[in-house]
Amino acid sequence: MQQKGSGFEIPNYTARNCKQKCLSQNSTVTKYLKPFVINFQPNFSHIYVERDAFDFELTDLTLSKFPRATVIKIGHYKDVFNRPGQDFQIQKSSMKLILAKKTEPFLYPASDMVQEFGTPNVYYNTPILNCLYNCDYCYLQGMYPSGNVVVFVNENDFMDAIDLKLNELDDPLKPMVVSISYNTDIMAMENIIPMTSRWIKFVDTQENLTIEVRTKSALFSSINNT
């Protein structure tokens, strides 16, 4: 699906499946849903912005990528993202973007079930909630009530939390590992919001830090010069 005015494509893998699913229902549901299923709004046609998230560089950058988007001011991202009665799969066919300012905590200890990387200093953070993709096997479908995407624009707060933790590691002789794509595919967002490249530059300033970026995206050209 092509977002007008953005100059790039956002993957949309569910519209066809959703259409087939809806049209297979009873005639009443089919009659009501058919025009909407066929004519979804483009992805990110609407961007919700927390009132406290406007004065950030990432907010300005993101809004500049979508000059035709309808911008809606909200009090808190959960008012939209966590509201009841949402349909994850339908929303995936017309995703909306939510820009928010995260509050503490900015860093979480990793579960004992994850790979240890040979160090006890393993953490994750959540600069983005949800994903552009909609993989059948992904746990996010059962984790979030919404198919929309939340981006936390106060990236410096995430990095400051890591700086503090580096001074109080469980084992200071071993590196700290932080997964920055635990609840998203951050690399898939790089042409929209260049978070991966910013995190790479941050890691270059640290001596005892490794970040993990898990991705199925092929947008490596977007970080070649980082």
Predicted regions and their residues:
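Cysteine-centered iron-sulfur cluster-binding motifs in ferredoxin-type domains/subunits
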Residues: 125-135
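Flexible, acidic/Gly-rich N-terminal and inter-domain linker regions that tether
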Residues: 2, 7-8, 12-121
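A structural signal for short, well-ordered beta-strand segments and their strand-loop junctions
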Residues: 48, 71-73, 124-125, 179-180, ...
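Conserved Radical SAM active-site core
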Residues: 98-117, 121, 136, 140-225
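Glycine-/small-residue-rich active-site loops that bind phosphorylated ligands and cofactors
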Residues: 54, 130, 187
